[in-house]
Amino acid sequence: MHVDQGAVAAMQEKGSSLLPKGIVAVKGDFVRGDVVRILGPKGAELARGICRYNHQELDKLQGVHSDQIEQVLGYGYGAVAIHRDDMVLL
């Protein structure tokens, strides 16, 4: 998945989890629990992590504030797309 510069800064400088708000594109098919690649605005791989949502869910959630996840999907697996404890920065 591709993330914006704000998400890059939050992950690299603050050690933050990846929130749906920072996702700008979802590519490929994956299910909840799969390890996915996180790419920055220029396409460079920044991290890998275990995703809490599948590709179809994240396609709907990209750019959405965490407090709106349940409104968009009708359910939720938490406020983050990938928790910092489930992520490795490269």
Please provide the spans of the model-predicted regions:
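Beta-strand/loop-dominated core regions that host nucleotide or nucleotide-derived cofactor-binding catalytic loops
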Residues: M1-L90
